[in-house]
Amino acid sequence: TATPDHAHTVHAVATLAPGTWYYRFIAGGVTSPVGRTVIAGPSPTSLRLAAASCQHYETGFYAAHRDIAQQQPDLVLWLGDYIYEYGARPVGGPVVRTHDGPEITTLDQYRARYALYKSDPDLQAAHAAAAWLVMWDDHEVENNYAALTPENPADAAGFAARRDAAYRAWWEHTPTRLAPPVAAQEYRVYRGAAWGDLAEFTLLDGRQYRTDQACGDAVLKLDPACPEIRSPGRTMLGDAQEIFLEDRLAGSTSRWNVIGNQTIMADATINGAVLNYDQWDGYPEARERFFAFLHAKAIPNVVVLTGDIHLAAVAQLRQGDSASGPVVGAEFISTSISSSGLVDASFTEILKKFPSLLDAELVHRGYALHTVTPEQWSAEYRIVTDVTDAASTVTTYGTYVVKAGTNTVTVAR
């Protein structure tokens, strides 16, 4: 039953046997289009997975979602930034359509913003095409918030209530089987899922438990003088979530160990200088603990799927030295569905200096389409020709492969 208390949303969950299922909703005499979902059996031989994030409504159309629907994946993994909280911007330049009012802070405003985004027909088609596994990032609440610390210190007094409203609206408007949040309490959304014995997913929450970003949350400053990043107790995930992650990986019997992650995990520093303190680079001891665990336990077939940064990149994860240390996993960073990227030529040159980075594409929007079998993981990076054109074509930029048992990425294109 859809009620006003839950913004007239429903979370319909039933016992489904493996196979393809089709569904629809009927309300008020109106019948929805038919949706498709696939439930994995105990030992599936393949998985087609679309990994996507960052769909700022104002800065582009959703041609990438149209392509996702056409590709008919088994599963869509959403890595965060389903909505953006910003107020309306004038149309022109990179803005192709506008938000419906000022920056959102209340439950009604967050609900209205979800309704606006979900009115897009290409996003609707992507939801109807496959089951979704959804996580949040920061813009579901506010840019670069950290636990109960807002981006702007002047907003601290009302931030807890704002976060409560945002978390509730997220639960109401996303396809999740989690219980609804309770105001003024932790809302645990980090969790696990599985695609039979082919892939074990661990979805991380890199916002609710983290220490505030160091050194003023600087971006592109390349300042190596930030001792704060190694202050005792700094964390990206919090103690309980770190234990949860390690326990799942240590106990996994699946072929592939997949981590749904928000910000870049690979080392993206240059001679010790941090490019972006919001990424795992701003929490080096937390990353070092995790990579040391992966190496010590010899966790096989680790694939980290990342969004947030609005660029496409492929990275090799190594313990210790990022150029020569032991390989502990692969990271596939998918670009944004529509959110503006970093296209400055100087930044492209900076990226080429990262020892852990194998390839990058900064200009285009899109997503990553992964094909998984027991033998290999293949990542196809799909890019939108023109995000300002609702009818834009979508093409393949590159394909990258990890052979099972290696944790090593090779460029296939």
Question: Each PLM stretch: what is its role?
Answer:
Residues 1-413:
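Metal-dependent phosphoester/phosphodiester hydrolase catalytic core
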